[in-house]
Amino acid sequence: VSIIILDLDNCIANDEWRIKEIDWEQDNPTARYHNYHGLAAFDEPGNTDLFNCLVPHDIVVFTARPKFYGAPTAEWLKRNGINFSLLFMRDNNDHTHSKELKRRFLVELIQGMGVDPGKIVCAYDDRDDVVEMYKKLGIPAEVRKIHDTCAYTAPSKILLTHQEQ
């Protein structure tokens, strides 16, 4: 059986509308992203060609969302017709960078669960660094994203000044 790996936020789930809910005043990432993750069940799906019923592969989902949001995440996947075989989520209060986190997920899939890496047809993610990591490990990978709004960098403070003439 062949496998594809899908990222969730901004790859198959359109999270752009909830990025404004990230509380950049919070130092703790769990608190910072709580409202953002809590609203994920209301996302619209995107890049549906990656998971529609014509996709002949088993779907494995790698997401940086904490396990605390596991039930609504699994429900969203099912409600949107994403027939996933496995869902990998970060441990609660684990703030590991996405690239390293997904590398660990891949190691667990291959070494821990005995999946032949040759069966992985492609891994899709919205982040260039994650896609490069997959490629360096011999996994075909492609960047697929729905939008270009970053959920990892606080928006810059723009100061507008008005000059009177």
Each predicted region: which residue ranges?
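A structural preference for long, well-packed, hydrophobic secondary-structure segments
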Residues: 94-117, 141-149
